[in-house]
Amino acid sequence: MATAKSDGQTRDAESICPYCGVGCRLWAESVYNQIIRVKGVADAPANLGGICAKGATLPQVISTPDRLIQPQIRVSRSGEFRPVTWDAALDHAVERFQAIIDKHGPDSVAFYGSGQLDSEAVYVVGKLFKGSIGTNNTDSNSRLCMAAAVAGYRSSLGADGPPPCYADIDDADCITVWGSNMAEAHPVTFDRVKARRKADPSVELIVIDPRRTLTAEQATLHVPVAPGGDIPLMNAVGRILLESDDIDHRYIASHTAGFDEYFHFITAESFDSWVEASGVPESVVRDLAARVGRSKTWLTFYCMGLNQSTVGMWKNNSLINLHLLTGQIGKPGAGPFSLTGQPNAMGGREGGLLSHQLPGYRFVDDPCHRADVEASWNRPAGSISTTPGLTAVEMFRALESGRLKAMWIAATNPAVSMPDLHMVRRALAKAELVIVQDAYHPTETTRIADVLFPAAQWSEKTGTSTSSERLVSRSDPIIDPPGAAIPDWQIIARFAQRMGYDGFDYKTSEEIWDEFIPLTKGRPCDMAGITSARLKKERHLRWPCPTAEHPGTERLYTNGIFPTSDGRAKFLPRTHREPRETTDHEFPLVLTTGRLYAHWHTMTRTGKSPKLVQREPGAFVEVHPDDAVQHGLVAGQIAELASRRGTLRLPVRINPGLSRGLVFVPFHWGDQHGEQTAANYLTISAIGRIAKQPEFKYCAVRLAPAPDALKPEPTYARTTRRDRPLRATVVETRSTSASS
């Protein structure tokens, strides 16, 4: 293994990439405290030496002039920030925070964090807010992307956590990508998928997506499901698998519960109505089912297309039903694999950052779980509230209504990333106190703050994170933090000490990690054997890893035993429900949002890279050519795109790879990059009943030429292979075993 080295002028070390949840291990070199080179680590299990454009351009975005290098405060929102010392900033913030708690109670304050926080920071947040202040009002931007997957795994399989690992790509003979544009959002993992197909062209790659994405361009079968049509499509596939008897009777009998109810539901409902609601021709539905049914090993990657929905948990359940039906789980090359979009979204789940969770996959509404954590934290019985806290959207609604008075925001930019941004901005404006902890200033959110805490970021600190495949990794610093910036956990611990709470006198991140992992012992995410000393030596281990001698676990449920009351996975029949907001005469089109290859989240990093900005310089709206004609638009023209909540002005890109009636806007741009460009001014803040995840993938909009915009010459704004009419695309696979 490579170890961190320094000769006083140059340093090099390994760390986990700070972008998506693939968990690419990177080697970086610095000279005079400036990063000059980054490359993938060849023997790293996640990336095998691979690196995407975002990772490769990290040297361009770390040491920039807009780094937040000193704490800052201001007396009023209309006033200017002034730099202060850490002592002054903490004293000021704690005094105001405590005054609000004293007057309005502990549930009047909240912490809104991120999947970019290290596990050590996540743990300290919970200990402060849930164990000391006495409120469960901590949540994360992971609520916006992963909550439905968490709820889906837990309800179907008994616990959170993806059963497969990346190595399963090499054993799969059918790979489905459902509601994920892996080629742009998780490119290094998708490179492994492409390598698998290159090595064996008979491998199926099936992509289910309303858009012909760069991922769909690589597919042997592209299934253009209607927006919101996933559950009826899954149910229709289940019906065909039952009728063709392409199911695993032995697995169903030995390892599952609820099959009779599922069978009755699937066979009693109208197959034709499911096909119609899916928006997919019946012949294509049958083709999809046949390809899945004949596969010996079937692996499904899925992401925001399933999760970001008011029925996201149900979509997860419906997909898992198909894997249980075919016995495609708990073996090499198989399983439902939820991809995370941030480097430590998994770690936040393990550490209990979400408002209903406690460390070690425990839950605040379970008295035994609360007692376990209170004992570990040396807190009196009853210290942890019995009521789950507010979730992300609920927090901002509570700010707007006055129920919540103060919010501490860390490592995220909700003034761009939250749905219904007009509501979010009204909410933040009404807050008595907004603390923002970030590496950069200004951002759209720091502009609204009262107190700014400067945080060290990637390459500047030691920390731990968990990737999509349950791989726990250590990152080491390559440079020193600028100015007075310090790691997130230190900021939170100092704040807690200022509030008078004990148990926060940590000297190193390793102390925190070693305090945290005993709380996972015996839990589904058991990391008791992944000590800081072992991580420093071995770099990464995959949980469950219960002892210091344990090598880690490649995939879950290989014995067919699940962490449920009867040890069986659950079939959960789910019916089709229309999205919360539907189209009508006034708003006849559907808006969906998503990522681009060149950017990440709200561009607080990628927007500083000249190479990445050159690739994607500005926001746009993609429109099907028939819809463009109907609404009087041509490529390059500025259009006015409006929902019931807001209006944008964006240049048009014509893309026949969209379903008719669907428009697409990337969500990366905010007000700092131009007015009326943030997609989330349009999106709806409707959330699911259990997962509480917002509906980013479906809202009703109208489209028209901007009244004061010049009409350009008709030309395509972009020419790519996906600029072809959308239909189910079939590519015949080739057998590698045929005789010559």
What are these regions (language model features)?
Residues 1-246, 254, 258, 262, ...:
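N-terminal export/assembly segments and adjacent metallocofactor-ligating motifs
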Residues 77, 175, 218-219, 268-272, ...:
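Flexible glycine/proline-enriched surface loops and loop-helix/loop-strand junctions
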Residues 77-83, 246-282, 363-374, 382-384, ...:
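N-terminal leader/propeptide and maturation segments of large enzyme subunits in energy/redox metabolism
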Residues 104-108, 247-252, 299, 330-337, ...:
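Flexible, glycine/charged-enriched surface loops at secondary-structure junctions
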Residues 110-117, 277-280, 303-310, 342, ...:
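Conserved short loop/turn motifs at secondary-structure junctions
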Residues 123-194, 201-208, 215, 231-235, ...:
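Extended redox/cofactor-interaction regions of prokaryotic respiratory oxidoreductases
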Residues 217-225, 454-456, 460, 470-482, ...:
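Short beta-alpha connecting loops at secondary-structure transitions
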Residues 482-484, 488-538, 606-622, 626-740:
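Long, contiguous, secondary-structure-rich segments that constitute the structural scaffold
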